[in-house]
Amino acid sequence: MLVARDQERLAVLADDLATSYGVQSEVLVADLSQRDGMAVVEARLSDASRPVDLVVNNAGFGLKRRFLDNDVEQEQAALDVLVTAVMRLTHAALGPMTARGSGGIINVASVAAYQPRGSYSAAKAWVTTFGAWAAQEYGEQGVRIMTLCPGFTRTEFHARMDVRREAVPRPLWLDVDRVVDEALADWDAGKPLSIPSKRYKAIATLSRHLPTSVLHRFQSLGRR
């Protein structure tokens, strides 16, 4: 099942999956910054007659400007996608999963969760904390939950935020395939938290101990 707000791109992706891997995909067009969009996906996930074995909450976007420079409705939309949608879709999926005693959820956060990076960082910190609790709470009922915290990854996400790649040290950039491979390896190993690459594991660990002033310099990387 594929979920996004761009129907045309979803159709292209579904066709590609069918052609390349012989996978038939169910497509749901939904804007997860809107409650009615969330409701469409919630209804599908809570339908016990059509069980979903694994949910990956990967919807998200970042805002180009700093907190006070953004319209408050932009901040609210980001919060709805990054936090509210994760909470509601996890809640919807957990009902059927706990009832049958199996299933899994991967919530995509960010290594930014460990750094002072405005409302985006705060949202990802919520996902990380929520995931750590949920993994323990529902693991006893047969449902696995893992939080994925990638760093700078070569996707259109950072381009849309006007992040200058050349301003970020090359060793900090990760390829999508590497992030996916390490995340799936951690999933297979039963880990509740996945931080791809040793360097980002080190950054996450150090971030818990470094002064906020030092972390603030790091969080400005790539900003115009």
Specify the residue positions occupied by each region the protein language model found:
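Active-site helix of classical SDR
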Residues: 90, 123-126
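Substrate-binding pocket helix/loop in short-chain dehydrogenase/reductase
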Residues: 66-79
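Conserved glycine-rich Rossmann-like NAD(P)H-binding loop of the short-chain dehydrogenase/reductase
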Residues: 1-12
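Conserved NAD(P)H cofactor-binding loop of Rossmann-fold oxidoreductase domains
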Residues: 58-63
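C-terminal helical subdomain
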Residues: 147, 167-203
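A short, exposed helix-loop element centered on a Lys and neighboring polar residues
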Residues: 90-91, 132
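Residue(s) in the substrate-gating loop at a strand-loop-helix junction
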Residues: 110
